[in-house]
Design a protein with these regions (language model features):
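Hydrophobic helix-coil surface modules that form long, contiguous segments used
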Residues: 66, 159-318, 347-350, 359, ...
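Solvent-exposed beta-hairpin/edge-strand motifs
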Residues: 78-101, 504, 508-513
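Glycine/proline-rich low-complexity spacer/linker segments in large multi-domain proteins
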Residues: 35-42, 119-120, 128-172, 216-221, ...
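N-terminal, polar/Ser/Thr-rich
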Residues: 24-66, 77, 93, 137-141, ...
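A surface-exposed beta-strand-loop module
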Residues: 86-143, 193, 526-536
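Non-catalytic accessory/interaction domains
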Residues: 171-174, 179, 189, 196, ...
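Bacterial Sec-dependent N-terminal signal peptides
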Residues: 1-29
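Hydrophobic alpha-helical and helix-loop surface patches within well-folded domains
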Residues: 3-7, 25-26, 40, 200, ...
Length: 854
């Protein structure tokens, strides 16, 4: 018998559901992908497969029609099922569940399927829809997907969480002259009526953020990575770069693959190894299984490439190859542990180079690659731990940054040193075997490693992984009769409560004609170094001489006169880094003094990586920590010293680094005229090799200075032949205009998302827009730039918020700029804490400049 009262009650509950978005089952519907939702879905859903079809028209403005068949098993069927789809409901056209067409319910970024349409066991969902495009990166004649961390849901309905791995079938319908690449091998392609249908075999088991395809007008190179055939798609047209790079690109991949197979004792775990070079790619690379994507400019280098550029390419390829095991084969359970895949990729990429370059070069490269970048965040009041909490994947992009990419490998190096290399390797191998094709967390790994370690890793883990910051190290050295009678080393936290960072480091005592190195186990707030007692008093002491210790180390002023006599390149690099870090903290040395010290070494430093480090520091000190008045007074002398050092140095790459430094800092008319002649005649100084990209950079630098008309930029544009590079140049040009109104209009245009699509180009343009020589007119953009940050985080890719802030605030030093940041943070006391931290990280040099310039 029908109970009218129950019907009425049911209607009321249904009405409440519609207007509140709350599930009567107790499962709340909220934007993003909450951790609660992810945990529930993982507990009931398994054996997921997606069969997807995208019909991609030749015209970018035309919509992409898509079809999806999704199959999965349910172990329980008591709640409304939520599929993630961050698009308008109007783009969902037809929904069929287990053979039955049902009404479409969609709100708060979720497609909802009521339990009555589902069943325990196997289920099938078919959807006809218009594809979302937020993560499709559509261009005029190519596109590529980029779904990390939670952007698959912007393109098609799915379970967009890393621990619901799935297999994927894919069909792409594209223009006949396009090529396509995906995770699975290409089964076949059929041409008909000017269109091409590409069908791909079922992929390996992947998380949604690793599902990918690339399609468009690309060239294709077939080569081998190890024993496998490998297809490489690219759009580069510069034959010098292609001829100089192609064989090396495949070789670096093959070498990296062999190293990781040997080190992990696990053969390459997937069916194919293809990759694509993308113009103006947002990241360095992305580890999509079977279809890795790279930034084209990092892969393709000509004969003018510096050691830093060559290292960056090798590192990048090794990094993405390492991800095949660390991230793809074993994936983090939740993005709280996204750092795990990145730390292993970076750390293992570094290790893969050690055998070929030798320990000394490896140690130096590791130091200069990771420590300055890690300190750049960890010294700030906005620093974050390596491992962070995350309640919703919509905020997962804020987890990325230099802490996980650079401090985490340093932590891992200390962990390997603590355990020993063999035991560390044994533990990691067990971890990979145990969680193959599955998901794992940091506690899963640390519990395994703990079995192989003598030390208490749980306690060690607490300060290194779960807390932010770095130690500040100081010392006292007591002397008696020319001997060291007592040597005490102290450590304390730079910010926050008292903490101890257990670590090993080396300290070297330098004497006339010789030196003595001491290894220190710094595992307490105060360590008495018994080994030093009775030694002769040295000329000077260098802390962290091997470059493996992490913290703010003392700088012995007695070292200054002997700095360039230190024989080991890694020790000199460590000294340079410590000097710079201490300068920022107002210890031992002032900015102008340090600038002079570094400039004096430009003709003496013999190691290219060190010269690159020094020139970076010179540029930063010059623009950020000297007043405009002091810069103007110093400019002619500085220019002459840099140019003279360039003439003294004999190696082409050393000369090029110094030429680029000269280009960065020049202010005088004489220097401008000299550079203009180099650019106009396209004749580099003797011994310096410049590429088209270098002349483009030179044109940008000259356009910033007064007295250069717009014909310079137009002529440089006419020299560029590659279509993608031309578009990049045209995008950046307004940011360099001498007309303030045109620059205002450019900044205003960035308020529209469509004008921010090429994020790497936006970052380059913002750098020039906010260059110190333009800050008197660009400071007015700062309030709006901060106001836009939340939208930037919501609409952009993972690195864009940091890039937006860094290229905007990176060179400001004025009280006005500092006040804008302070006022913004005061005005928004409940601001997203992770974004607030990024503001503090980026503005740290600004606030330090205010203190140091007083």
């Amino acid at each position: 018998m029908l109970n009218n009262r129950n019907v009425l009650a049911g209607f009321i509950v249904f009405f409440i559901l519609l207007i509140t978005g709350k599930q009567v089952t107790g499962q709340e519907v909220e934007t993003g992908v909450s951790k609660k939702l992810a945990i529930y879905r993982k507990s009931v859903i398994s054996r997921v497969h997606y069969a997807l079809e995208f019909d991609i028209p030749s015209k970018r403005a035309d919509k992409i029609v898509a079809m999806e068949t999704m199959s999965f098993n349910l172990s329980e069927n008591k709640r409304v099922l939520q599929l993630d789809f961050k698009e308008d409901k109007a783009k969902l056209w037809k929904l069929k569940v287990n053979g039955k067409v049902i009404p479409i319910q969609h709100h708060d970024e979720h497609l909802l399927i009521e339990a009555r349409y589902l069943k325990k066991g196997a289920n099938q969902v078919k959807i006809e829809f218009q594809s979302g495009e937020a993560a499709l990166n559509r261009n005029a004649d190519y596109l590529y997907t980029l779904f990390v961390p939670d952007r698959a849901r912007t393109v098609f309905p799915c379970f967009d969480q890393p621990d619901l791995k799935a297999t994927y079938g894919l069909t792409l319908k594209v223009p006949a002259d396009w090529k396509a690449m995906a995770n699975g091998p290409l089964k076949d392609s059929v041409l008909a009526s000017g269109r091409k249908t590409c069908r791909f075999a079922t992929s390996d088991t992947l998380s949604t953020y690793l599902f990918s395809f690339v399609a468009g007008k690309f060239e294709q190179q077939v080569g081998k990575v190890g024993p496998m055939r490998s297809d490489f798609l690219y759009r580069e047209t510069d034959t010098a770069k292609i001829n100089n790079s192609m064989n090396e690109i495949f070789k670096i991949h093959s070498d990296a693959l062999k190293y990781f197979e040997d080190w992990t004792a696990i053969p390459y775990p997937f069916r194919k190894f293809d990759f694509a070079a993308i113009p103006d790619f947002q990241f360095g690379g992305m580890e999509h299984v079977g279809a890795i994507q790279y930034k084209a400019s990092t892969l393709f280098l000509d004969g003018t490439a510096t050691k830093d550029q060559l290292n960056s390419r090798s590192n990048l390829i090794a990094h993405e190859t390492a991800h095949m095991w660390f991230g793809d084969l074993v994936t983090m359970t939740w993005f709280t542990d996204v750092w795990m895949k990145e730390v292993f990729a970076n750390f293992m990429a570094d290790k893969s180079a050690e055998g070929s370059v030798g320990k000394a070069v490896f140690d130096l490269k590791f130091l200069v690659d990771h420590f300055p970048a890690a300190y750049g965040v960890d010294r700030t009041t906005g620093s974050n731990p390596i491992r962070q909490d995350l309640d919703n994947l919509k905020d997962a992009g804020t987890m990325y940054g230099n802490i996980i990419y650079h401090k985490a490998p340093i932590m891992m190096q200390q962990l390997e040193r603590l355990m020993g290399k063999e035991k560390f390797q044994q533990g990691v191998r067990e971890y990979l075997r145990k969680f193959t094709n599955n998901n794992a967390s940091w506690p899963d790994l640390i519990n395994i490693l703990d079995k192989y370690a003598d030390a208490d890793l749980q306690q060690w883990n607490k300060v290194w992984v779960n807390e932010p910051g770095r130690p500040v190290v100081d010392y006292t050295m007591e002397k008696k009769n020319g001997k060291i009678s007592k040597f005490i080393i102290k450590q304390g936290a730079e910010y926050g409560g008292a903490r101890i960072w257990p670590q090993f480091f080396e300290m070297t005592l330098y004497y006339q004609g010789y030196s003595k190195e001491v290894t220190v186990n710094l595992n307490a707030a105060q360590t008495e170094l018994k080994e030093a007692e009775g030694m002769d008093v040295p000329l000077f002491v260098l802390f962290n001489s091997s470059g493996q210790g992490y913290g703010l180390w003392p700088s012995d002023r007695a070292m200054f006169n002997h700095l360039y006599t230190i024989d080991q390149p890694v020790s000199r690099a460590s000294a340079y880094i410590s000097l710079y870090e201490n300068m920022l903290n107002g210890r031992y040395v002032k900015p102008a003094e340090l600038l002079n010290l570094f400039v004096e070494g430009l003709s003496k430093e013999t190691e290219e990586l060190n010269l690159k480090l020094m020139t970076n520091y010179i540029g930063t000190i010059y623009w950020e920590f000297l007043s405009p008045t002091d810069r103007a007074a110093l400019s002619e002398l500085l220019e002459n010293k840099i140019w003279s050092a360039m003439l003294v140095q004999t190696k082409a790459n050393h000369k090029k680094l110094l030429f680029k430094t000269y280009q960065d800092v020049f202010l005088t008319k004489e220097a401008g005229d000299r550079l203009y002649q180099v650019w106009k005649s396209q004749t580099a100084p003797e011994g310096v090799k410049l590429s088209e990209d270098d002349y483009t950079s030179l044109a940008f630098s000259m356009a910033l200075r007064p007295g250069r008309d717009s014909t310079l930029m137009k002529e440089q544009l006419s020299r560029i032949n590659n279509t993608d590079r031309k578009k990049r140049f045209e995008f950046i040009m307004p940011a360099l205009s001498s007309d303030v109104v045109e620059r205002d209009q450019f900044f205003k245009s960035l308020e529209l998302k469509v004008n921010r699509e090429k994020e790497s180009n936006v970052g380059a343009a913002l750098y020039y827009l906010h260059h110190p020589l333009r800050q008197s007119t660009s400071v007015k953009y700062l309030p709006k730039s901060l106001e836009m940050l939340e939208e930037i985080q919501t609409t952009g890719d993972i690195f864009f918020p940091q890039n937006w802030l860094q290229t905007t605030f990176g060179y400001y030093q004025s009280e006005e700029a500092a006040q804008i940041v302070t006022d913004f943070l005061k005005k928004h006391p409940n601001y997203n804490p992770k974004l607030r931290a990024k503001v503090l990280q980026t503005a740290d040099n600004l606030f330090r400049a205010r203190r140091l310039l007083k």
